[in-house]
C-alpha cells in the first residue's frame, strides 16, 4: 500500500471537501471535462492518486471517529463497584443521610468526574465562606478594640477634668477659709460665707503674696525668679471664672486677681528675664 504524508497542499485539497458550498457532482463534472482534454494515461494516474488519497483520509477519519466514540463510551461506562461504593459512602457522610439510592452505584465515570468536580467547588465555596466570616470577625474585633480605646481616652480626659475641678475647688476652699484660720486658728466647718468674710480672706491672701514677693526681691539675684510663687499667682487668677454668676463675690475676686497680677508683674520687672510669665 502506498504511504502518504499530509502536506500543506493536501490540507488545501482536503479543506475543499469541507466547504459548505461544495457540490460533489459539479466537482466530478469539472474533473471529467478536464480529463477529456488530457492524455488517458495521465487521467488514470490522477484518478488513482485521488482514490488513494480518499482511501487514506477515509481510514484516518474513521480511526479518529472510532477513537472518539470509544472514549465517550468509556466515560459512559458504569463505575467499578469499589469506586461507586466509596463515592456513595462519602456522599452519605457529607450529607449526614442516605440520600442516594442503590442506583447511584451504577453511575458512569463521567458522572463521577462531574460529581467530584462539583464537590471540589462546594468545598472551595465553604472555604471562602469561612475565610469571609473570619475576616468579618477580625474587623468586628478591631472595631471593638477601637471603641474601647476611644472610651478609655474619654475616661482619661474626664478624670483629668474632674481632678482639675477638684483642684480649683480646693483652692477656693483655701481662699474662703483664710480669714477663719487667722481668727480662730482652725479651718472652716462649712458655715455660710458672707461677702465680708470673703473680702477679708482675699485681703489676707493678697498680703501674704505681697510679703512673699517683697522677700523674693530682697533675697534673690537679678536672674533668679520664684517660679512656684508665680505659678501660684497664675493659678489663683484662673479661679476668677468660678465666681461668675455670684456678682458680689465675682467683683471682689476680680479686684483681687488684678491686684496680685499687677504685683507679680512689678516683681518680674526687677528681673533680667523675658516678659510673659503671667497670663
From Swiss-Prot:
In terms of superkingdom, the source organism counts as Eukaryota
Q: Which GO terms describe its cellular component?
A: cytosol; Golgi membrane; Golgi transport complex; mitochondrion
- Read off the Gene3D superfamilies from this record: 6.10.250.2790
Bilayer topology annotation? Peripheral membrane protein
Question: What are the protein's UniProt keywords?
Answer: Golgi apparatus, Membrane, Protein transport, Transport
Compartments in which it is found: Golgi apparatus membrane
Which BP terms from GO are recorded?
cytoplasm to vacuole targeting by the Cvt pathway; intra-Golgi vesicle-mediated transport; retrograde transport, vesicle recycling within Golgi
Q: What else is known?
A: Present with 1360 molecules/cell in log phase SD medium.
Fill in the subunit field for this protein: Component of the conserved oligomeric Golgi (COG or Sec34/Sec35) complex which consists of eight different proteins COG1-COG8.
Role noted for this protein: Acts as a component of the peripheral membrane COG complex that is involved in intra-Golgi protein trafficking. COG is located at the cis-Golgi, and regulates tethering of retrograde intra-Golgi vesicles and possibly a number of other membrane trafficking events.
Q: What is this protein called?
A: Conserved oligomeric Golgi complex subunit 7
Species annotation: Saccharomyces cerevisiae (strain ATCC 204508 / S288c)
Amino acid at each position: 500500500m502506498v504511504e502518504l504524508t499530509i502536506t500543506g497542499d493536501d490540507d488545501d485539497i482536503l479543506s475543499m471537501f469541507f466547504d459548505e458550498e461544495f457540490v460533489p457532482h459539479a466537482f466530478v463534472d469539472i474533473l471529467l471535462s478536464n480529463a477529456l482534454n488530457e492524455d488517458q494515461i495521465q487521467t488514470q494516474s490522477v484518478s488513482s492518486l485521488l482514490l488513494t488519497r480518499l482511501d487514506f483520509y477515509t481510514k484516518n477519519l474513521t480511526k479518529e471517529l472510532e477513537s472518539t466514540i470509544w472514549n465517550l463510551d468509556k466515560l459512559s461506562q458504569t463505575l467499578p463497584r469499589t469506586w461507586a461504593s466509596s463515592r456513595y459512602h462519602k456522599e452519605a457522610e457529607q450529607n449526614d443521610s442516605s440520600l442516594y439510592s442503590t442506583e447511584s452505584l451504577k453511575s458512569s465515570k463521567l458522572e463521577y468526574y462531574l460529581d467530584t468536580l462539583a464537590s471540589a467547588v462546594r468545598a472551595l465555596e465553604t472555604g471562602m465562606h469561612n475565610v469571609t466570616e473570619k475576616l468579618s470577625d477580625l474587623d468586628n474585633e478591631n472595631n471593638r478594640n477601637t471603641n474601647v480605646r476611644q472610651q478609655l481616652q474619654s475616661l482619661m480626659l474626664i478624670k483629668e477634668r474632674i481632678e482639675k475641678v477638684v483642684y480649683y475647688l480646693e483652692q477656693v476652699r483655701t481662699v474662703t477659709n483664710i480669714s477663719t484660720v487667722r481668727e480662730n486658728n482652725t479651718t472652716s466647718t462649712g458655715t455660710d460665707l458672707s461677702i465680708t468674710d470673703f473680702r477679708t480672706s482675699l485681703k489676707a491672701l493678697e498680703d501674704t503674696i505681697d510679703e512673699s514677693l517683697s522677700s523674693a526681691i530682697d533675697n534673690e539675684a537679678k536672674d533668679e525668679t520664684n517660679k512656684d510663687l508665680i505659678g501660684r499667682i497664675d493659678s489663683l487668677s484662673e479661679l476668677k471664672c468660678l465666681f461668675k454668676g455670684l456678682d458680689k463675690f465675682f467683683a471682689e475676686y476680680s479686684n483681687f486677681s488684678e491686684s496680685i497680677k499687677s504685683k507679680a508683674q512689678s516683681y518680674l520687672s526687677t528681673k533680667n528675664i523675658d516678659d510673659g510669665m503671667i497670663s
